[in-house]
Amino acid sequence: MSYTALVKNELVSVPELQTECELAQLSALIRVSGTLSMHGPGKFAVRIVTETGTVARTVISSSRRLFDLGTSVEYRRSIMHKKRNYLLEISNQDSLAEALSALGIYIPGEGLVSGIPKSVIRTKQAQRAFLRGAFMAGGFLADPLKDFHLE
């Protein structure tokens, strides 16, 4: 297991007690590793790809707990790189538009939100949760015991 995967697994185990922190974390996860598809007025689908199983479980459990969203999971293994990929899809559901609005990703009648909305990161705890989610979605950390490199 890579050093980055170990760090992500450790971050997933950080207890989230406040709903606003879980919202901020899920918002970052979707913003960084998600793809939003629009299928007509008010009809959306979100697709998230991750290599880490614990991150996939976090997205599934948070979206279910916060918004009662169903998520389909597809597991693929890359032959060339010998890595796992988890493909999560939240297809068009009644509460998906409301969820995207609460996560600060989409505003009905206005469109996609650029930047990080202040409503998502009001407190220091929510800001930390947002950064944690962004790292879990697309971060990399080199093992400090090995050679360093710059990306």
Label each PLM-derived region with a short phrase.
Residues 1-60, 66, 114-151:
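Intein-associated homing endonuclease modules of the LAGLIDADG/DOD-type, together
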Residues 62, 66-115:
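A generic, well-ordered mixed alpha/beta core segment in the N-terminal half of proteins
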